[in-house]
Amino acid sequence: MASDERLVSERFPRSSQYHPEWVLANASGGANSLWLTEWLASALDLRPGMRVLDLGCGRASSSIFLRREFGVQVWATDLWFSAAENIQRIRDAGVEEGVFPLHADARSLPFAPSFFDAVVCIDSFYYYGTDDLYLNYLAQFVKPGAPIGIAEAGLVREIEGELPEHLRAWWTQDLWALHSAAWLKRHWERTGIVEVELAETMPNRWKVWLDWHHAVAPDNATEIKAIEEDGGRFIGYVRVVSRRRGEAKLEECCWPDSLVGGPDSH
């Protein structure tokens, strides 16, 4: 099967309208950001004019997709890809009036409290968000009742004990940041900051992952072999959708800059 054919899928009708060459040229990670954005957006009530933070947007293809498909205003925020690079891509896509690129660290964001109507994180949350204190920090930027959603590479179930043999050649230390939907749901709910509405694994998750890698990195034999041998036992795509609780109390001294001046009792 040609790579172009792999990027056209009945599962993702909106994404399939984008030219495969554009999708591949703007890939910035190990997942098809359009597929994951479409999957996540199907569980969100996105409406024209909403202010959306696309956190860890990479080359901003997810931000362009959100603007084109839903008419939202998007703050395309990333640390590893410059705003100068992303603005050119945004202009080329004809969405400069509604997508605003920003170079920023997810742990030091320059936004006002309650500025956004939604936050989405596409295949990026595991890089910065699994710290026990991070949700308290991130939630301040969305309005009470607004959604925080993630869709990313993850685990079908947590790995207990030793790493399975078939994953060892591919696995690196940073992959321990991958978690299951159930783990993320528990991690968020225990804070009382959000109400988790949805936490699940993508159906045929490993096959979608495999299709993408055959298209974008067919020479990556190590990862392709790991996905094939795993067969959906451990690795796949997950999504979690939550809403900030209106009554939730956020701790101002919790993260990140204010750690230096925390409460005296600590």
Please identify what each model-predicted range represents.
Residues 20, 153-175:
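Short, glycine-/aromatic-enriched active-site segment of Class I SAM-dependent methyltransferases
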Residues 197-266:
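Conserved Class I S-adenosyl-L-methionine
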Residues 31-48:
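Conserved alpha-helix/loop element of class I SAM-dependent methyltransferases that forms part
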Residues 53, 59-108:
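Class I SAM-dependent methyltransferase SAM/SAH-binding core
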Residues 176-192:
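Short alpha-helix
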